[in-house]
Amino acid sequence: MTVWQAIVLGIVQGLTEPLPVSSSAHLALTPYFLGWSDPGLAFDVALHFGTLLALIWYFRREWLEMIASAWRIARTRRVETVHDRRVLYLIAATIPGGIGGLLLNDLAETTFRSPVVIATSLIVMGILLWAVDRWSARARVLEEVTLRDAIIVGCAQVLALVPGVSRSGSTMTAGRLLKLDRPSVARFSFLMSMPITLAAVIVKMPDAVREHGASLPLLAGVAAAAVSSWFAISVLLRYVARHSFGVFAVYRVLLGIVVFATLASRT
């Protein structure tokens, strides 16, 4: 893999990971359409390290508050504040994704990366995102998230193991179904993505280093993912404060149709 290819894939990862359009689908489809060799799931996960850095920096105040809350809970054995509850809810939301990742890891690396699976997932989740977002009332904010909400959204995160579903797409759809407003569901989705992304990076980064080495392309890809992720996070949070998820749903469906049309033309 060249430095240029790694940078392109890093930008693709960074721009699409925060958006409900499936970064894994874009990372699998980009080499397919450009005629590059598939760098594999380990490289994709390594690029997530760049996104993780962007998330940590963007939400640094929230994480500092939650770290303080976790320390307070450990000392007092009491849950008293909104931040205390959020710590417990994020832990609860992370567990289903961790279990799903362990059980479905082999399928995620092989069968799930099929263009047919990706195109189908893009279209189906796009329709679900549009329908749920359109008919869910704007009712609750982030401070009103309950343990039940966290577990349901966490279970939805498991679906993201299928490229084309999108972690952001599945969790934001679940959050809107639970009648959380768009800015709140976006922020909660980002916060809950960090522990599971960190776990995936810890597990898969050694594989990426073995396959690609601690090389300039790998480092360039991670850096490109970090910068573009920070940009995408800031743009999305401003956008959903005023607009629906409709544009992302339409994009998903159109991309899925393009993939199917391309596959048909090559057979």
Swiss-Prot record:
<protein>
    <recommendedName>
        <fullName>Undecaprenyl-diphosphatase</fullName>
        <ecNumber>3.6.1.27</ecNumber>
    </recommendedName>
</protein>
<keyword id="KW-0046">Antibiotic resistance</keyword>
<dbReference type="GO" id="GO:0050380">
    <property type="term" value="F:undecaprenyl-diphosphatase activity"/>
</dbReference>
<keyword id="KW-0133">Cell shape</keyword>
<keyword id="KW-0997">Cell inner membrane</keyword>
<dbReference type="GO" id="GO:0009252">
    <property type="term" value="P:peptidoglycan biosynthetic process"/>
</dbReference>
<keyword id="KW-0573">Peptidoglycan synthesis</keyword>
<dbReference type="InterPro" id="IPR003824">
    <property type="entry name" value="UppP"/>
</dbReference>
<dbReference type="GO" id="GO:0005886">
    <property type="term" value="C:plasma membrane"/>
</dbReference>
<dbReference type="GO" id="GO:0071555">
    <property type="term" value="P:cell wall organization"/>
</dbReference>
<comment type="function">
    <text>Catalyzes the dephosphorylation of undecaprenyl diphosphate (UPP). Confers resistance to bacitracin.</text>
</comment>
<feature type="transmembrane region" description="Helical">
    <location>
        <begin position="216"/>
        <end position="236"/>
    </location>
</feature>
<keyword id="KW-0961">Cell wall biogenesis/degradation</keyword>
<keyword id="KW-0472">Membrane</keyword>
<feature type="transmembrane region" description="Helical">
    <location>
        <begin position="87"/>
        <end position="107"/>
    </location>
</feature>
<dbReference type="Pfam" id="PF02673">
    <property type="entry name" value="BacA"/>
</dbReference>
<keyword id="KW-1003">Cell membrane</keyword>
<keyword id="KW-0812">Transmembrane</keyword>
<keyword id="KW-1133">Transmembrane helix</keyword>
<keyword id="KW-0378">Hydrolase</keyword>
<dbReference type="GO" id="GO:0046677">
    <property type="term" value="P:response to antibiotic"/>
</dbReference>
<feature type="transmembrane region" description="Helical">
    <location>
        <begin position="112"/>
        <end position="132"/>
    </location>
</feature>
<feature type="transmembrane region" description="Helical">
    <location>
        <begin position="39"/>
        <end position="59"/>
    </location>
</feature>
<dbReference type="GO" id="GO:0008360">
    <property type="term" value="P:regulation of cell shape"/>
</dbReference>
<feature type="transmembrane region" description="Helical">
    <location>
        <begin position="145"/>
        <end position="165"/>
    </location>
</feature>
<feature type="transmembrane region" description="Helical">
    <location>
        <begin position="183"/>
        <end position="203"/>
    </location>
</feature>
<feature type="transmembrane region" description="Helical">
    <location>
        <begin position="244"/>
        <end position="264"/>
    </location>
</feature>
<comment type="similarity">
    <text>Belongs to the UppP family.</text>
</comment>
